[in-house]
Each structure stands twice: as C-alpha cells, then as structure tokens.
Amino acid sequence: NSENLAENLSSDKATNYNGALATLVTVFFFWGFIAAGNGVLIPFCKTYFNLDQFQSQLIDFAFYGAYYMGALMLFVVSSLKKTDIMNKWGFKSGIVKGLILSAVGAGAMIVAVNGADPGDSSAFAFILGALFIVALGFSLQQTAANPFAVALGDIETGSHRLNLAGGINSLGTTVGPLIVGAVLFGTAAKADMAASISNGSITLSSVQYLYVGVGLLFLLSAALFKFSNKLPDAKADANFIGAKKALNTLIAITVLLIVVFFFVFRQYSGLAPGAKLDDKADHLILILSAIGLLAIVGGLLGANKMAKSNPKGWGAMQYPQLVLGMLAIFTYVGVEVSIGS
C-alpha cells in the first residue's frame, strides 16, 4: 500500500520528488478541466442536437458512469485473478495506461464530431462513447494517482501533497468552463446560440481542435511519466484479499441499474428527432430513477448490516465508516455535478 511505499522511500531521496510531484499534479488538472468543461458542452449539445434535458445530461451520465465501471472492472479482475492489478502494475504504470486510454478517447472524440450535422443523433451517441473512454482512463489515473501522491515522500506529509493536488484539480475546474466556452462560442451570447448554429457560425469543429490539444497533452504527460527517472515505479504488495460478498453486492446493484436504465432509454425508442416525451413517460422515468437511487443506497446499507453479523467475505465493506463514506461522496458528487450542469 501507499504507506509501505512511502516508508520504503529513503528520506535523502524525498527531496528529489518535487519534480515528480509537479508532473503528477498535471494529471489532477486534467480531471477538473475536462469534467467542468462538460458543463459547457451539455447546453451546447442540447441545442446543437435538439435534445431534451434528460438526453443532454447523458454527457455526465457517460462520463461519470465510466468512473464507476472502470473501478468495478478493476475490482472484478483483481478478485478473479486474486491479485491487486494496480499494485502489480505499479502506480506509475497505472497512470501511464490511464493517460493513453484517455488519449484514445480524445482521438475518438475528434472522429465523432468530424462532419457532425445539427440534429445528428448518431453523432451524439459517438460523442458519448468517446467521453466514456476518456473518463475510463481517468478512472485508472485516479485509482493510482492518489496513493502515488502519498507515496512521493514522507507519509506524514502525504496529506499536504494531496491538498496541493486537490488545489490544482480545482484550478482545472475553474478554468475549464472558461476555456471550453471560449473555444466553442467565442464572444457569442447564449441567447444567440441557436441562431449561430443554424447559420453555421458555431460548429463542432472547434471541439475537434480542443480535443486535439487535450489528446496531445495526454500523450505528452504519459511520455513524461513513462520516461521520467525521477518517478518511482511505486509497486506494492499485489496480494489481494478476496471480498466475494462485497463483489456480488456491487454486481447485483450494477445489474439492477442496467435494467432500470434499459427501461428509461426504452421510452425514447421510436421517438422522432426533436420530439418530446409525454407526461406519462416523464413520470415513469422519475419513478425508475428513484428505484435506481434506492438500489444504490439500500444495497450499500444492506450490505453493511449483513456484514456486521458475519464479516467474512465482505472485505472493507464490513466497516460502517467506509460504507457511510461511500454514501457521503455519492451524495456530495451527485449534488455538485447536478448543480454544475
């Protein structure tokens, strides 16, 4: 784990990790920049592709859904192989793999928006897929970067490095919407967006230029991580303590969510471009969303309750502070993203 890694880094080398930390925090900047930039992309795509509010919010759904699926897949593979995949790779290698995956997503975004016409729903679907790949890479990066930041020096000052990285992440969150908005709209007012799209003065080609730059930065950062002698591999004990009951619970929650959203998306089947759902369909989507929310909260609380009576097979989910922390982060991030978009 990161504590053992930090203890293994000798104190005379700790001062050499300043450059390594500077490289690492650039990754934190990317997360904030892209995630906050989606808040500008949502209303733009809503107008450009003639979407309703739910459809436009699929941008955040695809983006943050990738975080969940990436972490879940890593947990599933580690459980099946009985090996902690990230510790086996090393945090440095994990970040490099994540950056390359995000670069692939940036390339997919360039292809997705190429020649996309207003109202082209198939192009919007490809944009969602590209964002999913970008965020899937972020999922790998975040899994590795946080413990890596702690490992880059004295364990007692690990929280200081995390605070610094978090501050840089917030900087990306601050400037992301400004830069993305300037790239997309220039000086055009929001009220003129529909007219500007109709007369062709605002197109998706600007998104191409943005993601060309972002993709190149991903690759540059990956190269810096890969070939930097100042960055340790940061590998740790790859032994994996199985948590079969926790795994089954998370898979069950995921399957239920897939079923819920299958019926949500089914409401849009056969709907003409630009057409709106009727009140009955809107009401059903609201009910299904509530069921999905209950599945997450109820599943986690139920798992913790069962783990109290028999902790075997539950792993870290036997501890209430973990489950309650998961729910707190779920609530906080949900509110933060909803307000921002």
Give each language-model segment a name.
Residues 71-125:
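Conserved MFS/SLC helix-loop-helix module at the cytosolic interface between two early adjacent transmembrane helices
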Residues 157-189, 218:
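Glycine-rich segments within core transmembrane alpha-helices of 12-TM secondary carriers
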Residues 1-31, 47, 117-123, 309-321:
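Cytosolic juxtamembrane N-terminal segment immediately preceding the first transmembrane helix
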Residues 57-84, 171:
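Central cavity-lining transmembrane alpha-helices of secondary-active solute carriers
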Residues 180-189, 212-239, 250-271, 287-308:
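C-terminal membrane-cytosol helix-exit motif in multi-pass small-molecule transporters
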Residues 38-42, 177-185, 252-288, 315-341:
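Extracytoplasmic gate region of multi-pass secondary transporters
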